């Protein structure tokens, strides 16, 4: 059984990375990491690639919007770049898979909306192939608002999309969406390219419901792995398909680099990554 390779989503240290990308990457390398997951890279791909090369790190995966004309953030909606611009930047950095990190809950709340998401994923997979890239989707909790034909909307998208479309399962948000996370991991099977390794105590109500108050996502109770209620060990041992174990904190509970180091140590000590 091959083990996933550790990585870290750069959103975890978004402020530190924006302030000093080179120093941030050097600190990740000092922890022992060799890979990162890129974030907010479209506007400065050459700069990010240079910083990665200097630190000896690579970014095999990255987050960027591919399925939306504008993107929600805690500070308001922002316009998204054209898919071609995203893919060109990804190729410069050296990504192999570009993962869409968020599609608005309202689009996940109807069968037509979910089908449209799947169809756009198929179309962008075709486009990405012309750049030598693949695409994927990363969940929050809105992907579990409705069931279609007896399965979650996320799984409906998996069934409706080409095998080239990968899934990156955020284990914390899947639990927030009411899922039996290890069972979901098993059902996703070979489509599961990566997981976001994230622990904590999930909100009492899904903050990504159509009419939910999303400001609660500014105050999440996230913890180091093994200190929350997410069944990380069971979920990660439920499959051997996962290629990347991506450390992430939406809000780090302490010093961000210490927390990343603790997550990295957890993965190695539990035999969940190598």
Named regions from a protein language model:
Residues 1-93, 268-274:
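N-terminal pre-domain/capping segments
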Residues 4-10, 36-38, 59-64, 98-100, ...:
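Hydrophobic faces of well-ordered beta-strands that scaffold small-molecule active sites
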Residues 14-19, 35-48, 66-81, 105-109, ...:
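Acidic-and-aromatic substrate-binding clefts and catalytic sites of carbohydrate-active enzymes
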Residues 35, 74-166, 187, 257:
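Active-site acidic/histidine proton-transfer and metal-coordination neighborhood
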Residues 45-53, 84-92, 122-125, 180-193, ...:
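Short amphipathic alpha-helices and their capping/turn segments at secondary-structure boundaries
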Residues 49-68, 121-128, 155-162, 230-235:
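Alpha-helix-loop-beta-strand connector modules within alpha/beta enzyme cores
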Residues 130-229:
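Acidic/histidine-rich catalytic cores of soluble enzymes
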Residues 255-274:
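C-terminal helical cap(s) of enzyme catalytic domains, especially alpha/beta-barrels
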